């Protein structure tokens, strides 16, 4: 029986980081058993402004903000089309690619989390994005998700020259074992090289001998 196809949520904002993200997804995931959902949260006002707590109506009256909104919508529409064509070039079919543009509800990060609860196998996004309004940095959604998303694997993508070469920091914990499992599930193919890296801290034996309080009770010296 054929394995069930995995559904991957790819959060994009149309920036250069998102372009690198699409290339990474195309080169890393198998088009045979993966469905891709291109997901964008549309905000009326840049996230940086929303974080200031200043009234939204004030910014909507600004010509530069209205221009940003129109430009942002056009950019996302064009990017979605280009992203779909790019993924087709990697072997994905039109039926395996879904494009979703939704209005911001609870915040970009929280909206992504809520979407990820709908049967996804993983979430992929870039490290940060940049708006075109006075070169303001929108703020890293990835950093907000790292501490909040525990139910599915979160893959944060930067600029990668070799997405088929993977380094796993392995400490023998249950979480590390889960990471290995997910890498095996997603990054299939004979051309994928995985390195398990475990760093051992050196033990200062001299310090242990000189400071008996650092020794376990059974190893403490006994006075005659």
Task: Please place each PLM-identified region on the residue numbering.
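Small/aliphatic-rich secondary-structure junction motif
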Residues: 2-65, 165-223
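A generic structural signal for alpha->beta connector loops
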Residues: 33, 94-96, 151, 191
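Alpha-helical scaffolding segments of alpha/beta enzyme cores, especially the outer helices
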Residues: 27, 82-85, 144, 185
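Short, flexible loop segments at the rims of nucleotide/cofactor-binding pockets, characterized by
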Residues: 99-104, 133-134, 146, 172
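Residues at the C-termini of beta-strands that transition into short coil/loop
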Residues: 42, 103, 158
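A structural preference for short, hydrophobic beta-strand core positions in alpha/beta folds
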Residues: 38, 96-101, 156, 196
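Gly/Ser-rich helix-loop-strand patches that form or flank binding pockets
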Residues: 3-7, 17-18, 22-31, 109-165
